[in-house]
């Protein structure tokens, strides 16, 4: 029986501290996390690597999370999308989910709530956390 591999997550946020925190938290939860600081960087990574989940900020320096979701779904149509943002009103949250996306968390959120949302979205896709995986997907950050 083949071993499960780590679920691959791409987190896109223009705030470097948020990217580092997300990579650390989800890495500790046994996910393989890569980060991007822009729409352009996210699209580059998504064209090279197959992901299981995208975690997107709504407001990015070079676009919106909603527009990025649409673009990412063109490249990887079956990947779950979790919005993670501090800027959304109830209306904006509903709009984002109606257009493109599977779930929404408003910053700040507790670690347990974040891990639960990620696990639930991955479970809907039939993906669990790897146990004793030999595959390593390092947490990364864009160059300074």
Predicted regions and their residues:
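Alpha4 helix (beta4-alpha4-beta5 surface) of REC/receiver domains from two-component response regulators
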Residues: 67, 88-105, 116
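C-terminal output helix
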Residues: 91, 109-118, 126
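Short amphipathic alpha-helix used as the core "switch/output" element in two-component signaling
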Residues: 66-77
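Two-component/phosphorelay signaling modules centered on CheY-like receiver
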Residues: 16-34
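Acidic catalytic/metal-coordinating carboxylates
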Residues: 38, 64-67
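Acidic, metal-coordinating helix/loop segments flanking the phosphotransfer/catalytic sites
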Residues: 35-53
């Amino acid at each position: 029986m083949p071993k499960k591999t780590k679920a691959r997550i791409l987190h896109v946020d223009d705030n470097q501290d948020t990217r580092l925190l997300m990579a650390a938290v989800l890495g500790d939860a046994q996910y393989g996390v890569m980060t991007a600081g822009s729409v352009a960087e996210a699209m580059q990574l998504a064209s090279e690597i197959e992901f299981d989940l995208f975690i997107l900020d709504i407001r990015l320096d070079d676009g919106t999370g909603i527009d990025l979701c649409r673009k990412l779904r063109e490249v990887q149509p079956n990947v779950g999308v979790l919005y993670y943002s501090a800027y959304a009103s109830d209306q904006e949250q509903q709009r984002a989910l109606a257009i493109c996306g599977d779930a929404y968390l408003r910053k700040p959120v507790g670690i347990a709530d974040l891990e639960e949302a990620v696990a639930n979205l991955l479970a809907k896709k039939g993906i669990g956390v790897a146990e004793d995986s030999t595959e390593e997907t390092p947490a990364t950050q864009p160059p300074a």
